[in-house]
Amino acid sequence: YQLLINDAETGEIHNFSAATGIQLPNAGFETWTNSKTWYPCSADEIGSNGMGTGYTGFWGTGNPGANAAGIVVTEPADDPRPGSTGSKSALLKTQSAFGVIAAGNLFIGAFGGVHNITKGDVYMGRRFTFNARPKAITFWYKGTVGSGDKARFFVCMGKWSSYHKIDTNDQSTFFDPSQ
C-alpha cells in the first residue's frame, strides 16, 4: 500500500500481506450426524435433545422442528463444490406437512423448539473469534428453481455477548437486514 496525499506520492512503499484467518467450523459441511434427523455437526455436539442451548454445533437447521412432522428440510448431499477437496454439501429443500410449508434452512446457531404446532424459536449466533479481518465471505450454491421460488442469503456479524432469539410467532424478534 502507498499513501497518497492530494494525488501525490509520499513516503516509501511498503509491502505487507494480510494474515490468513481461520475458517468457520464445518465450513465445507463435511461433518453430519443422523440422530432422529440430520444435524450439520458431530454427534457429541447434539446434546440431549438436539435443540436449544444444549446443542453446541456451530451450524443449525430447522430439522428438529420439521422432524415432529416427519420431514427433513436440510441434509447432507454428495454434491461438493466443484474444485473443492470435500465430498459433501448441504441440501436445503422445501417440504410440506399438515398443510404447512417448511423451507430448507441453515444458520449459525441452534433450533430452540416448536410451539403452537407451526411456530418455533431459533437461537441465532455463536461465539467465534476471528484471528484476522475477513477479506471476503464467499460461498457456493446451486439450485433447482421452480415457479415462485425465492432464495435469501443474509450475513450479519456483530459483537454480541449472547445469541439472538427469534420467535417465529413474534415479528419484533425477526432479523431485519436493513438495521
Regions found by a protein language model. Give the residues of each.
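Disulfide-rich extracellular repeat modules and their boundaries
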Residues: 7-9, 33
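Aromatic (Trp/Tyr/Phe) and Gly/Pro-enriched flexible surface segments
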Residues: 16-134, 138, 149-179
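Extracellular recognition modules
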Residues: 2-6
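Short amphipathic, basic-aromatic surface patches that mediate peripheral association
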Residues: 141-145
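Extracellular and select intracellular beta-sandwich modules with Ser/Thr-enriched
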Residues: 9-17
